[in-house]
UniProtKB/Swiss-Prot annotation:
Top-level taxonomy: Bacteria, Pseudomonadati, Pseudomonadota, Gammaproteobacteria, Enterobacterales
Record's protein name: tRNA (cytidine/uridine-2'-O-)-methyltransferase TrmJ
One Pfam family this sequence matches: SpoU_methylase
The family this protein is said to belong to: Belongs to the class IV-like SAM-binding methyltransferase superfamily. RNA methyltransferase TrmH family.
One Gene Ontology cellular component annotation held by this UniProt entry: cytosol
Function: Catalyzes the formation of 2'O-methylated cytidine (Cm32) or 2'O-methylated uridine (Um32) at position 32 in tRNA.
Top-level enzyme category: transferase
GO MF, any single term: tRNA (cytidine(32)/uridine(32)-2'-O)-methyltransferase activity
Organism whose genome encodes this protein: Klebsiella pneumoniae subsp. pneumoniae (strain ATCC 700721 / MGH 78578)
Catalytic activity: cytidine(32) in tRNA + S-adenosyl-L-methionine = 2'-O-methylcytidine(32) in tRNA + S-adenosyl-L-homocysteine + H(+); uridine(32) in tRNA + S-adenosyl-L-methionine = 2'-O-methyluridine(32) in tRNA + S-adenosyl-L-homocysteine + H(+)
Length: 244
């Protein structure tokens, strides 16, 4: 199951951080590392700081875009240390671990970490179902990348160990199949095109409404069957609009 947990690093700028993250992952039983458009490629420093976790570095998936790293995932959680203008469903690290293990039993889960200096952009955070914030000392809350990964990875491992020790998993059981990130993005594209065609949103300012709708559907988290119903509704609206 732990192989289904992806640690995704976006535009990492120091190879030493890649190695330190790999070490933090492997100590908690995680090995699935994805690097999104890294500003430098893994090198000897990454291997040195991996300290026995060089296999995690060697097997890392390197992709150009975040969408590629999220493809096939049913749950995406992004790390965020700042309050945003558009509030989003939040988890603490323990909740993140529980939810990741529950859903990781059935489909890949992505835990996304941003750039060393500026974190994730708002656009990247809007691709996530939830945001997770680490409740560090408010007077000195600066965690480096590997520290943040270690905290989240530890909570994932604790949730996984609890599930192993119980006849019934000690995590929330996800009965309903949730759509993959790819399916959700197609739905958002379909929704935007339909709302543009009906004149509900303006072609030159679609973002504000679409961002709020993304937040709404992220909070509601429709199941796969429910998403298919929504897609059918949009198709029906399109047909009616064409007939006018």
């Amino acid at each position: 199951m732990l192989q289904n947990i992806r640690i995704v690093l976006v535009e990492t700028s120091h190879t030493g951080n890649m190695g330190s993250v790999a070490r933090a992952m492997k100590t908690m039983g995680l090995t699935n590392l994805w690097l999104v458009n890294p500003l430098v490629k893994p090198d000897s420093q990454a291997i040195a700081l991996a300290a026995g976790a060089s296999d995690v570095i060697g097997n890392a998936q390197i992709v150009d875009t975040l969408d590629e790293a999220l493809a096939g995932c049913s749950l995406v959680v992004g790390t965020s240390a700042r309050s945003r203008t558009l509030p989003w469903p939040m988890l603490d690290p323990r909740e993140c671990g529980l939810k990741s293990v529950a859903e990781g039993q059935h489909a890949p889960v992505a835990l996304v970490f941003g750039r060393e200096r500026v974190g994730l952009t708002n656009d990247e955070l809007q691709k996530c179902h939830y945001h997770v914030a680490i409740a560090a000392n408010p007077e000195y809350s600066s965690l480096n990348l590997a520290m943040a990964v270690q905290v989240i990875a530890y909570e994932v491992r604790m949730a996984w160990l609890a599930a192993q020790e119980q006849a019934q998993p000690a995590v929330e059981h996800e009965e309903a199949p949730y759509p993959l990130v790819d399916d959700l993005e197609r739905f958002y594209d379909h929704l935007e095109q339909t709302l543009l065609a009906t004149g509900f949103i303006r072609p030159n300012h679609p973002g504000q409404v679409m961002n709020k709708l993304r937040r709404l559907f992220t909070r509601a988290r429709p199941e796969s069957q429910e998403l298919n119903i929504l897609r059918g509704m949009l198709a029906s609206i399109e047909q009616q609009n064409k007939g006018k």
